[in-house]
Every structure is written in structure tokens, then in C-alpha cells.
Regions:
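Hydrophobic membrane-insertion alpha-helices, especially the h-region
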Residues: 5-26
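Alpha-helical transmembrane signal-anchor/signal-peptide segments
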Residues: 27-50
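Acidic/histidine-rich helix-loop elements
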Residues: 79-85, 208, 212, 287
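C-terminal regions of proteins
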Residues: 248-324, 331-337
Length: 337
């Protein structure tokens, strides 16, 4: 009897410790609800109905520029954007791999901007992509592929090792969203209504090298093979930003890769006039990304390409889909006012 009480006491202490440790960890971990909201976008996908015809993968050039709500409104396409800030191609690969465990879209659209970056860049950006992923084989892989020399795997398993110093810098957000999350996107699209027109772009200077790195090509090959194994069409794009410059040499390399692998590739930087973009009105940061006005134009244009060239169908007459998206559009239009 005494032994049983001792065991129960030990269990009770362990339970209290685990709960307290979990609560403190949650308190100190960034909430990404009202500040640095880009860090919370990856997790919003998990609560979605997994019935999308199109999945966008990539960096800020997808979550800022492509609005699934407009693609549904204009073409009846169901799409989701799994984009994060400065998402590197090996991160895109693992996010794609995870996504294909949840659903099998008809088309995956990958923005090739990250082909420029062959090495990990900044730990802070990695966190925005990785922290809110659910634990899985893919999360382990993305951590191992992304860590800088200064990072440790343990800091991802136990975020308190990374964020313990936030104790002195807690804000009201940390308490308001301690037990709940806040959705900030519309199917992965982060709406920006501000206007900051292009006034002057930096000089277009020659680069020391235009060649994409071997590591980037390896992961693009892996993404191509992964889509093929799942019967998904991979479409490559370069979003229509004015800066950083997408050089002709960059474009030629992607054209060559797409041709060799039988993939469609759209360099939308060359379609700016056709799309109807006006960078005195359609950008919120002087030409790097599109605002709501620009995203509406681009999404309608690209949605039409997907219908005409990739066999996507109008799903607005499907009752279940219409019920879901009518409510999504109501919230989207309310936010757009």
C-alpha cells in the first residue's frame, strides 16, 4: 500500500511538472497572432478541409501575390497557399511532402525564386517556417536540412531553449493567445491593402555568378519526382516582382530544367503588362510584393491559365464546396473593405 502511494505521488509530481513545463513553454514561445504573423501561417493549413485542386508552395512571393479566394471567385478553383517568409527550396520540399500526406491536388505550383539561395540564411526565418509545423518525419527532415551551425535540434524539440529570454519581453499577445490561435490568412494568402508605389529601383548590377547551386537543383529534382509519384502535375512559376531582379540567366536555367522534365514554367515577370499590373497602385512595398489590388489581378490571370492549360474545372456548382467558400468569401470581402 505504501509502495502504491509512493508510485502515485511520483506520477502526480511528474504530471504537474510536465503540465507546468508545457505551460511555460507555450507562454514563452512566440504566438504569431498579431506580430510576425508570417510565423503562424504554416499551422493554419491543418484545420482546413483537404480538398484543394491547387497547392502553392514557396516564399513570400506566393503568400503575398496569389489569392485563392479570387481564384475561386473568378474561376471556381479551390487552392491553398503553403508559403512562408524566405522559404528555402529544401523547406519547400518537406512542406510539399507533408502536404501530400494530407491530400492529392491536381496541380502543385512552385515559385522558383528560392533557387538563388543554396545555403541556410537566417535562423529567424527558419523559425517562421518550422516552429508551427506538426511533429512528423517531415518536420524532422526540414529541421535537419535547415539548421545553421549555431542551431541545435534540441532547441526545436524544446522551444524553451530558444525562447527562454522572452520572459522579460512578454506582451499582451502572449497572454491573450496562450490557449488559442488566430488565423490571419485566407487559404494561406496574407492580405495587404496598403499602397506604397514604386518610385526608384536599385541599379541592375551584374552578378558574380548566375548559376543556381547543386543543392537547389537536387531538391527541385526531388520535388519533381515526388509529384510524379503522387500523380500530381508540377508547375513552375516566377512571381511578378520588380525587385530583387530575376535575370535572364536565371530564367534560362529554369526554362532548361522545365523542358528536360516536361514541366510548364511561367515567368510572370515578363507578363506584367498582360496581367494589367500597375506598380504605382498594386504594391504595398515598392515593387517587391503585390497588395490586394495586385493580387486580385494576378490571381484572376493565373487562374485562367490553370483552367485553360491544366484542365482545372469550375467547382462553384458543387454544393459542399460552395457552402464552404461562400462563407470564406464573406469573411474575405469583409476584411477587404
Amino acid at each position: 500500500m505504501k509502495k502504491t502511494k509512493t508510485v502515485l505521488s511520483v506520477i502526480a509530481v511528474l504530471v504537474v511538472f510536465v503540465l507546468a513545463f508545457g505551460l511555460i513553454t507555450r507562454l514563452l514561445t512566440p504566438k504569431y497572432a498579431t506580430d510576425l504573423v508570417e510565423g503562424g501561417m504554416i499551422a493554419e493549413y491543418y484545420d482546413e478541409e483537404k480538398n484543394h485542386d491547387v497547392i502553392f508552395i514557396g516564399d513570400c512571393e506566393v503568400y503575398s501575390n496569389f489569392s485563392p479566394m479570387e481564384m475561386y471567385r473568378q474561376q471556381g478553383i479551390t487552392a491553398y497557399v503553403r508559403g512562408t517568409s524566405q522559404q528555402l527550396i529544401w523547406q519547400s520540399y518537406y512542406i510539399l511532402k507533408e502536404t501530400l500526406k494530407y491530400e492529392t491536388p491536381k496541380v502543385v505550383v512552385y515559385n522558383v525564386n528560392a533557387m538563388r539561395y543554396d545555403e541556410p540564411i537566417k535562423e529567424e526565418f527558419h523559425r517562421l517556417t518550422i516552429d508551427e509545423m506538426r511533429w512528423s518525419e517531415e518536420k524532422v527532415g526540414i529541421i535537419q536540412a535547415s539548421m545553421t551551425e549555431e542551431e541545435t535540434f534540441a532547441s526545436y524539440v524544446f522551444p524553451i531553449l530558444r525562447y527562454h529570454s522572452r520572459f522579460q519581453h512578454l506582451t499582451s499577445e502572449d497572454f491573450t493567445y496562450l490557449f488559442r490561435d488566430k488565423d490571419n490568412t485566407f487559404n494561406g494568402y496574407l492580405m495587404k491593402k496598403e499602397v506604397l508605389p514604386v518610385e526608384k529601383l536599385p541599379a541592375k548590377r551584374p552578378l558574380a555568378s548566375y548559376e543556381f547551386g547543386e543543392k537547389c537543383y537536387d531538391y527541385l529534382e526531388k520535388m519533381t519526382q515526388l509529384c510524379k509519384e503522387h500523380g500530381v502535375e508540377l508547375v513552375l512559376i516566377k512571381a511578378p516582382s520588380l525587385y530583387p531582379y530575376w535575370y535572364e540567366q536565371h530564367d534560362a536555367q529554369i526554362q532548361d530544367f522545365a523542358s528536360k522534365h516536361g514541366l510548364a514554367y511561367y515567368d510572370l515577370t515578363r507578363q506584367i503588362e498582360t496581367i494589367g499590373l500597375d506598380f504605382t497602385q498594386d504594391t504595398y512595398d515598392a515593387g517587391l510584393h503585390l497588395n490586394l489590388s495586385g493580387a486580385t489581378k494576378l490571381s484572376g490571370y493565373f487562374g485562367k491559365l490553370l483552367v485553360e492549360n491544366h484542365g482545372l474545372e469550375d467547382r462553384r456548382n458543387e454544393l459542399e464546396i460552395a457552402t464552404i467558400y461562400d462563407e470564406k468569401l464573406r469573411l474575405y470581402d469583409e476584411a477587404a473593405k
